[in-house]
Amino acid sequence: NYVLVNADGAKVIDWGTDRVLDLNAIKTTKIQVVDTWNHAGYFENSFYTEAFQQVLLAESKTAYQVKSPKQVTHIFRVKSPLLSKNQVICLSGSFKDAENWSETHLFIMGKSASSPFFELSLNLSKDQFPIAYKYGVYDLELKKLIQFEAGDNRVLHHPVIKDQITIV
């Protein structure tokens, strides 16, 4: 967990215990992690409690496997607990392989049944940074994008560095 120490010395610990990196699974000499604070008061955290995960949302979980490129420069990880059955997270953006936001070139994110994270490995070595991107909801049964997340585009300022993987 992350710990925020305020100017007065008071400590605030972020919520959750699911942010784990398996360093043995990452084949590189350098790792850069770009993460966000998870405040305990965020209402979304209630959907990761045992009552929701084991009972109320158990039927809606969809596991999905994706292939990784031979060379990986960036790994995107995101959680989304309130998807319907057969829905997964996808990613699109201004990078080359997404064909500049094309809805026919979406990147479907993989998810194992035991993990709360959707994950996608990409090779962005031929792209210009910064890169704009968004997550979306994709229906595997309908084979189409349902919607992109609301709000401004996310921006990735972390370019490819030799022998480094960036985890977002």
What is the role of each PLM region?
Residues 129-133:
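Exposed beta-strand face motif in extracellular beta-rich ectodomains
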Residues 5-26, 80-128, 138-161:
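Aromatic-rich carbohydrate-binding modules that target alpha-glucans
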